[in-house]
Amino acid sequence: MLKGRHLIDAMDFSIEELEEIFKLSNEIISREKEFSHICEGKLLATLFYEPSTRTRLSFESAMLRLGGKVMGFSEPGSSSASKGESIADTIRVISCYADIAAMRHPKEGAPKIAAMYSNIPVINAGDGGHQHPTQTLTDLLTVKSIKGRLSNLKIGCCGDLKFGRTVHSLIKAMSRYENNSFTLISPEELKIPNYLKKELNSKNVKYEETKNLEDSIESLDILYMTRVQRERFFNEEDYIRLKDSYILDKGKISRAAKDMIVLHPLPRVNEISYEIDKDPRAYYFKQAKYGMYVRMALMIKLLGIQ
């Protein structure tokens, strides 16, 4: 039963509960009009302390398509946070107005704090470089829809593996399924955090670290590309030096299997050449559409409507 629950971490839900969400997502995809009034009278609060286009609009369009309404803010300067109000007090007040909340915050753990003080379900829409669980649900639904399975896959994660919260959530989630392995492709400065490697080791999940995309791409079922995130760098010189570390182009993808799929949480900067968009293995825009449907299903479940 997911009614009244929070989603803060990709591991908050069991595999069985995730399957419930994926099943409902597919029902919405196939019969969307039947769900167009299911959230009438419900209000989503979008509390975005950090800039976002895709995630915020995905949440908002999800609720609007379900017949509900949306309120919130898209930057801290337009909220009482600019006056020094705490997250705890903000969510207490929001709980008086809304039925469910989606929060993005630059500080790791902020949505967890909000959940502790909230009387309504809180969804983590990204906290610093930590977690992005609804993107993970999006990624899993995309993989399941295209590959037909979430196990026995070789997953390549490429780019910013240090600050990339989408990658952290994806690795944690996919490591729960049988016989998945990871190829972690990044420059030395942007390697995956040690705590994630310890988790993989504790589960006996196979992984390898490399700096070479060309030699790794041939054996992958999934290539998950990420951008180097300018907003996580304190030194502009370091960002400029690392931002072009990996660019997926025709030459590199020509070495990949015909049934490999390329995913990206977006926004893209230049890590995927535009010429790849027409390649049948490019699924990142379809992935974005799946994100709206999975958020529709998630909110229905957390609100206990179905």
From Swiss-Prot:
Residue numbers binding L-aspartate: 83, 165, 227
Keyword hit for Transferase: yes
InterPro entries referenced in this protein's UniProt entry, alphabetically: Asp/Orn_carbamoyltranf_P-bd, Asp/Orn_carbamoylTrfase, Asp/Orn_carbamoylTrfase_sf, Asp_carbamoyltransf, Asp_carbamoyltransf_Asp/Orn-bd
Any Pfam family hit: OTCace
Residues holding carbamoyl phosphate: 54-55, 104, 132, 135, 266-267
Recorded family membership: Belongs to the aspartate/ornithine carbamoyltransferase superfamily. ATCase family.
Designated name of the protein: Aspartate carbamoyltransferase catalytic subunit
UniProt-listed GO biological process terms: 'de novo' pyrimidine nucleobase biosynthetic process; 'de novo' UMP biosynthetic process; amino acid metabolic process
Record-listed E.C. numbers: 2.1.3.2
Swiss-Prot/TrEMBL keywords: Pyrimidine biosynthesis, Transferase
Reaction(s) this enzyme catalyzes, per UniProt: carbamoyl phosphate + L-aspartate = N-carbamoyl-L-aspartate + phosphate + H(+)
Function of the molecule: Catalyzes the condensation of carbamoyl phosphate and aspartate to form carbamoyl aspartate and inorganic phosphate, the committed step in the de novo pyrimidine nucleotide biosynthesis pathway.
Keyword Zinc-finger assigned: no
Origin superkingdom: Bacteria
Oligomer and partners: Heterododecamer (2C3:3R2) of six catalytic PyrB chains organized as two trimers (C3), and six regulatory PyrI chains organized as three dimers (R2).
GO MF annotation terms: amino acid binding; aspartate carbamoyltransferase activity
Pathway where it operates: Pyrimidine metabolism; UMP biosynthesis via de novo pathway; (S)-dihydroorotate from bicarbonate: step 2/3
Principal EC category: transferase
